Amino acid sequence: MARIAGVNIPTAKRVVIALTYIHGIGTKFAHEIVEKVGIPTDRRVHQLTDAEVLQIRETIDRDYQVEGDLRRETSMNIKRLMDLGCYRGLRHRRGLPVRGQRTHTNARTRKGPAKAIAGKKK
């Protein structure tokens, strides 16, 4: 198994697909990386030479923000919004949907499991 950006890449998959296992690299960036390094898109990870793996690793370190750094920046951005006290920050703080979705009936994923409320006695 090749280890790139602190992630074990599956060896049986194509390089483009395997790179998407790294947080912060989707299909678009994976294709860009493979083109920059000059590896054919149909090549599998176990067929890569050590030099090619090193080139991929250097390209990712130089040009892309991935894994821990990306997660840290995302959490810092959310924390900044919460410290500002803006609407989006308040929604994050309360654990509600941030992007304008309705909350009357839906949003169970964001709000968590339904809380039981005692019904009205007859």
Swiss-Prot record:
GO MF annotation, one: rRNA binding
Keywords, alphabetical: Ribonucleoprotein, Ribosomal protein, RNA-binding, rRNA-binding, tRNA-binding
Stored InterPro entries: Rbsml_uS13_C, Ribosomal_uS13, Ribosomal_uS13-like_H2TH, Ribosomal_uS13_bac-type, Ribosomal_uS13_CS
Location of the region described as Disordered in the Swiss-Prot/TrEMBL record: 99-122
GO cellular component, as recorded: cytosol; small ribosomal subunit
Keyword Metal-binding in annotation: no
GO biological process terms held by the UniProt record: translation
Family of this protein: Belongs to the universal ribosomal protein uS13 family.
Function: Located at the top of the head of the 30S subunit, it contacts several helices of the 16S rRNA. In the 70S ribosome it contacts the 23S rRNA (bridge B1a) and protein L5 of the 50S subunit (bridge B1b), connecting the 2 subunits; these bridges are implicated in subunit movement. Contacts the tRNAs in the A and P-sites.
Subunit structure: Part of the 30S ribosomal subunit. Forms a loose heterodimer with protein S19. Forms two bridges to the 50S subunit in the 70S ribosome.
PANTHER family xrefs: 30S RIBOSOMAL PROTEIN S13/40S RIBOSOMAL PROTEIN S18 (PTHR10871), SMALL RIBOSOMAL SUBUNIT PROTEIN US13M (PTHR10871:SF1)
Protein name as catalogued: Small ribosomal subunit protein uS13
Name of encoding gene: rpsM
